[in-house]
Swiss-Prot record:
It comes from Rattus norvegicus (Rat). The gene is Epas1. Residues 84-154, 230-300 form the PAS domain. It is found in: Nucleus; Nucleus speckle. This is Endothelial PAS domain-containing protein 1. In normoxia, is probably hydroxylated on Pro-405 and Pro-530 by EGLN1/PHD1, EGLN2/PHD2 and/or EGLN3/PHD3. The hydroxylated prolines promote interaction with VHL, initiating rapid ubiquitination and subsequent proteasomal degradation. Under hypoxia, proline hydroxylation is impaired and ubiquitination is attenuated, resulting in stabilization. In normoxia, is hydroxylated on Asn-851 by HIF1AN thus probably abrogating interaction with CREBBP and EP300 and preventing transcriptional activation. The modification (3S)-3-hydroxyasparagine is found at N851.
C-alpha cells in the first residue's frame, strides 16, 4: 500500500514539474518575442530594454498605426534623403512645442521626443495612452469636437468641404516645475497648450488589396502641434524691438503699456490708459478677439491669432498677443491680465481711416500746420500762410472746432488777409478809436461810477465801525447788474468780465472797520447750529431785517462788504451795533440831524467805547428789499418787527449794549451820548472785549438764542401797556430798574461785564449803574417823556462821546433807590420778587462752551458726547 502511494505521488509531482517547466518555457519564449518586438521599435536600446510587455505592445501598436498613417499620406515614390534626416533633428529644436498625433478615439499614437522638455512626461510614458487621461476634464468636450470631422471652426469652403483645420486650447498635466524639477504625476499642475493642426483621413488597408469587395471605414487622426504658453514672469529671453508689454484689467482696459508702442503703433501710453482694447481692434477681427478673451478668462492663458490693431494716424498693424491671467496669491482670484504683443508688420494702409480716433489724429496734423502759420521765425510772408490756412479751413470746416479756445486760453485773432475778405461796415461802428482804451479798462478805473449806474441789486448800507447787525440784503463793494443786458457794455457786445468776476468774488477778510456787514441772503439758517438749552426749552431763530424804507442822510455811499464766512454771524456785537442798525433801519424818521449837543445823560460809556469815537454814519439801505437765497433774486420778504414796549419781557445778555428798540414819538427830545464816570471805567476793557465787533471773542449762542426769543415775545407783549407816564406816578427806575439789576445779576453771575467789582463800594450811585443796565437792555423810548440831564455833569466831560444825540434817549431821571434795597445785600436780591413772570436758565460759561459750534463747522454735541459733557458739568 505504501508503495502504491509513493508511485502516485511521484507521478503527480512529475506532472507538476512538467507543467511548470512548460509554463516557464512559454514565458521565456514570450519574453524573447516581446524583447524582439521591443528591439524593432524605433527607440533607443536603453529605453526598449526596460519596457514591460504591456508597454511594448502599446508602443508597437502605436508604431504600426503611425506607419499606416504615414504610408497613406505619403506617396510611395518619395524617398527620404539624407539631408531630410538631418533636418528632422533640427525641426524639434526649432519648434516651440511638441507634435502629437491623436486618433479619433483619443489615443495618442505619436508624440515627439521633446515633449519631456515642456511637460515633464516622456514620450514612452504617453504614447499609446488616451489623451483624456492627461487633460483637464473641462476640456474633454472641446477635444472631442476637434477630433471628429462633423464640427470645427476653420477656413474651409462653406457647405462644400468639411473644415479640417483645428485651433484650440487645452490644459494638460505637467510634472516639470518652473525651476526645472520633475515631480510625481500626482503632484502635476495644468499647463495650457495652444494646439494647431488638421484632421487627416486615411484608409486602413492599402488601395490595391481587397477583401472580397468589403471596404473598411475610413480612419481619421488629428495631427497637431502643441505649444505651451510661457508665463510673462518666467521669460528669460529679452524682448526684441518689435514687442511691447501691456497690462489690462479683466475687461481688457489698459492699465499699463510699454513705451515702445509709440514707435510701433503711434500711441502714447497715456492715451491708452483706461480705454478698452476692443476700441483698437479691427472690426473684422473683433469676433476672434472676443473668443480669445473668453478662452483667456476660462483657461488662464491664451494666444490670439494674427489680428489687426488700428494705428493712431490711420491704417493698422498686424499683431499677435499672448495673454496670461495673473492671480492674487492670497485668495487665488484673478487680478489682472498681462499681454505680450508681437508686432508682425509695419503700418499698412496708413491712408485708410477706419476709426473716429484716427480722424482726430489726422486733424492734429492739420492743426500742427495751422500752428506753424503763427510762427514768425519763418521767412515766408504772413499773407501766404494766411492763404494756406484759409484754403485748409475751407476744405475742412470741422477743423475749426479744434481751434476753439478753452476757458482761460489766450484768444489769438486769425488774420486771413484783406484780399480774401471784405470788411463789413456793420462791425466798424462798434470799433473803438486806436487811442481810446477798451471798455474793460474803463470799467477797471471807474468802479464808483458803475455802482451808481447799476443800482438794482446794490443796497448801500453804511454803519459804524462796529456795525455788525445782520442785513437782509446783499451789499458788496462792487455793483451787481440788474439785468442780463447790464453785463455787456454799450460799445461792444462783450461780457463785462470784471463785473462777472466781482459778482462771484467774496471778500475773505474785512478791509476796514466798516466791513462787518453780514448777509442773511447767502445763509442757510437750517445749517446753522442752534443753541441747545440745559433746561429743555428750545429757542427758535428769528430773522432781524428792516422793513420800512430808510432815508439816506449822507450823499456819499460808504463802502460795503459782503458776508465772508458762516461763522461771522456769531461775532460779538458792539454797543450801538447789535440793535443800533436795526433801530436806525426801522425808524429812520427820527434820524434827520447829526448835530452834537452839549447836554448829556448820566449813562456809562462802556456801551459805546467798544466802537469808534466817531459819529455814527447814516444807514442808507433800502429796508424793503426782500430776503433772497437765490443769488440776489427777490423772493419772500421777512415780516416786519412789532413795536417793543417795556413790559415783562425776557432780556438777552447779548443785547445789553444794544440800541433802544422802541420808536421815538414825534416831539421827543433829542438824546445825548453819556460819559464815563470814574468809578466804572474799569469795565471798559472787559465790555469792549466781550461785546466789541472787532473783539477776539465771539458771542455765545445762548445770547443769540435769548435775543431771538425776545423777538418772539414782542408779539405777545404788543397789547400790554409799556410804562405809566412819569408825570402821574412814581419814577419807573425806583422799582423796575433795581429789580432788573437783580435779574441781571442772577443771569450773568460773575461773568457779566456789567457786574460791579467786589472792590467797588456798595454806596456807589445806583442810578448810574441802573441806567447803564437799562441802557444795555435796550429799553423802548416810545412812551417816555423827555428828561433833563443832571446838573452834576459838565459839558466837557460829556462831550467825550461823539455819538449823534438824536439816536439815544434815557427813560429815567436821576434818582436813588430806597436805602432798604441798597443795604439788603445779595440775599435780599435773590429772594426779592422777579422783574419778569419767569426766570431764564442760569448758564455758566462751561454750559455755553459745550454747546457752542466748533469753528468752521456746524456740528453740535449729540448722543453720547452730549451726555458725557453734561456728566462732566455736574
Amino acid at each position: 500500500m505504501t508503495a502504491d502511494k509513493e508511485k502516485k505521488r511521484s507521478s503527480s509531482e512529475l506532472r507538476k514539474e512538467k507543467s511548470r517547466d512548460a509554463a516557464r518555457c512559454r514565458r521565456s519564449k514570450e519574453t524573447e518575442v516581446f524583447y524582439e518586438l521591443a528591439h524593432e521599435l524605433p527607440l533607443p536600446h536603453s529605453v526598449s530594454s526596460h519596457l514591460d510587455k504591456a508597454s511594448i505592445m502599446r508602443l508597437a501598436i502605436s508604431f504600426l498605426r503611425t506607419h499606416k498613417l504615414l504610408s497613406s499620406v505619403c506617396s510611395e515614390n518619395e524617398s527620404e534623403a539624407e539631408a531630410d534626416q538631418q533636418m528632422d533633428n533640427l525641426y524639434l529644436k526649432a519648434l516651440e512645442g511638441f507634435i502629437a498625433v491623436v486618433t479619433q478615439d483619443g489615443d495618442m499614437i505619436f508624440l515627439s521626443e521633446n515633449i519631456s522638455k515642456f511637460m515633464g512626461l516622456t514620450q514612452v510614458e504617453l504614447t499609446g495612452h488616451s489623451i483624456f487621461d492627461f487633460t483637464h476634464p473641462c476640456d474633454h468636450e472641446e477635444i472631442r469636437e476637434n477630433l471628429t470631422l462633423k464640427t470645427g471652426s476653420g477656413f474651409g469652403k462653406k457647405n462644400k468641404d468639411r473644415s479640417t483645420e483645428r485651433d484650440f486650447f487645452m490644459r494638460m498635466k505637467c510634472t516639470v516645475t518652473n525651476r526645472g524639477r520633475t515631480v510625481n504625476l500626482k503632484s502635476a499642475t495644468w499647463k495650457v497648450l495652444h494646439c494647431t493642426g488638421q484632421v487627416r483621413v486615411y484608409n486602413n488597408c492599402p488601395p490595391h488589396s481587397s477583401l472580397c469587395g468589403y471596404k473598411e471605414p475610413l480612419l481619421s487622426c488629428l495631427i497637431i502641434m502643441c505649444e505651451p504658453i510661457q508665463h510673462p514672469s518666467h521669460m528669460d529671453i529679452p524682448l526684441d524691438s518689435k514687442t511691447f508689454l501691456s497690462r489690462h484689467s479683466m475687461d481688457m482696459k489698459f492699465t499699463y503699456c510699454d513705451d515702445r508702442i509709440l514707435e510701433l503703433v503711434g500711441y502714447h501710453p497715456e492715451e491708452l490708459l483706461g480705454r478698452s482694447a476692443y476700441e483698437f481692434y479691427h472690426a473684422l477681427d473683433s469676433e476672434n478677439m472676443t473668443k480669445s478673451h473668453q478662452n483667456l478668462c476660462t483657461k488662464g492663458q491664451v494666444v490670439s491669432g494674427q489680428y489687426r490693431m488700428l494705428a493712431k494716424h490711420g491704417g493698422y498693424v498686424w499683431l499677435e498677443t499672448q495673454g496670461t491671467v495673473v492671480y492674487n496669491p492670497r485668495n487665488l482670484q484673478p487680478q489682472c491680465i498681462m499681454c505680450v504683443n508681437y508686432v508682425l508688420s509695419e503700418i499698412e494702409k496708413n491712408d485708410v481711416v477706419v476709426s473716429m480716433d484716427q480722424t482726430e489724429s489726422c486733424s492734429s496734423h492739420t492743426l500742427m500746420a495751422m500752428n506753424s502759420i503763427f510762427d514768425t521765425s519763418d521767412d515766408v510772408a504772413l499773407s501766404e500762410k494766411s492763404n494756406y490756412l484759409f484754403t485748409n479751413l475751407k476744405e475742412e470746416p470741422e477743423d475749426l472746432a479744434q481751434l476753439a479756445p478753452t476757458p482761460g486760453d489766450a484768444i489769438i485773432s486769425l488774420d486771413f488777409g484783406s484780399q480774401n475778405f471784405d470788411e463789413s461796415s456793420t462791425y466798424g461802428k462798434a470799433i473803438l478809436p486806436p487811442g481810446q482804451p477798451w471798455a474793460t479798462e474803463l470799467r477797471s478805473h471807474s468802479a464808483q461810477s458803475e455802482s451808481r449806474s447799476l443800482p438794482a441789486f446794490t443796497v448801500p448800507q453804511a454803519g459804524s465801525p462796529g456795525n455788525a447787525t445782520p442785513s437782509a440784503t446783499s451789499s458788496s463793494s462792487c455793483s451787481t447788474p440788474s439785468s442780463p443786458e447790464d453785463y455787456y457794455s454799450s460799445l461792444e457786445n462783450h461780457l463785462k468780465i470784471e463785473v462777472i468776476e466781482k459778482l462771484f468774488a467774496m471778500d475773505t477778510e474785512a478791509k476796514d472797520q466798516c466791513s462787518t456787514q453780514t448777509d442773511f441772503n447767502e445763509l442757510d439758517l437750517e445749517t446753522l447750529a442752534p443753541y441747545i438749552p440745559m433746561d429743555g426749552e428750545d429757542f427758535q431763530l428769528s430773522p432781524i431785517c428792516p422793513e420800512e424804507p430808510l432815508v439816506p442822510e449822507s450823499p456819499q455811499p460808504n463802502p460795503q462788504h459782503c458776508f465772508s464766512t458762516m461763522s461771522s454771524i456769531f461775532q460779538p456785537l458792539t454797543p450801538g451795533a447789535s440793535q443800533g442798525t436795526f433801530f436806525l433801519d426801522k425808524y429812520p424818521q427820527q434820524l434827520e440831524s447829526r448835530k452834537t449837543e452839549s447836554e448829556h445823560w448820566p449813562m456809562s460809556t462802556i456801551f459805546f467805547d467798544a466802537g469808534s469815537k466817531g459819529s455814527l454814519p447814516p444807514c442808507c439801505g433800502q429796508a424793503s428789499t426782500p430776503l433772497s437765497s437765490m443769488g440776489g433774486r427777490s423772493n419772500t420778504p421777512w415780516p416786519p418787527d412789532p413795536p417793543l414796549h417795556l413790559g415783562p419781557t425776557k432780556w438777552s445778555v447779548g443785547n445789553q449794549s444794544a440800541e433802544p428798540l422802541g420808536p421815538l414819538p414825534l416831539g421827543t427830545s433829542q438824546l445825548e451820548p453819556p460819559s464815563t464816570p470814574p468809578h466804572v471805567s474799569m469795565f471798559k476793557m472787559r465790555s469792549a472785549k466781550d461785546f466789541g465787533a472787532r473783539g477776539p471773542y465771539m458771542m455765545s449762542p445762548a445770547m443769540i438764542a435769548l435775543s431771538n426769543k425776545l423777538k418772539l415775545k414782542r408779539q405777545l407783549d404788543y397789547e400790554e401797556p409799556a410804562f405809566q407816564d412819569t408825570s402821574g406816578g412814581d419814577p419807573p427806575g425806583t422799582s423796575s430798574s433795581h429789580l432788573m439789576w437783580k435779574r441781571m445779576k442772577s443771569l450773568m453771575g460773575g461773568t457779566c461785564p456789567l457786574m460791579p467789582d467786589k472792590t467797588v463800594s456798595a454806596s456807589m450811585a445806583p442810578d448810574e449803574f441802573t441806567q447803564k443796565s437799562m441802557r444795555g437792555l435796550g429799553q423802548p423810548l416810545r412812551h417816555l417823556p423827555p428828561s433833563q440831564p443832571p446838573s452834576t455833569r459838565s459839558p466837557g466831560e460829556n462831550a467825550k462821546s461823539g455819538f449823534p444825540p438824536q439816536c439815544y434817549a434815557s427813560p429815567f431821571q436821576d434818582y436813588s433807590p430806597p436805602g432798604a434795597q441798597k443795604g439788603s445785600g445779595v440775599a435780599s436780591r435773590l429772594l426779592g420778587p422777579s422783574f419778569e413772570p419767569y426766570l431764564l436758565p442760569e448758564l455758566t460759561r462751561y454750559d455755553c462752551e459745550v454747546n457752542v459750534p466748533e469753528p468752521g463747522s456746524s456740528t453740535l454735541l449729540q448722543g453720547r458726547d452730549l451726555l458725557r459733557a453734561l456728566d462732566q458739568a455736574t
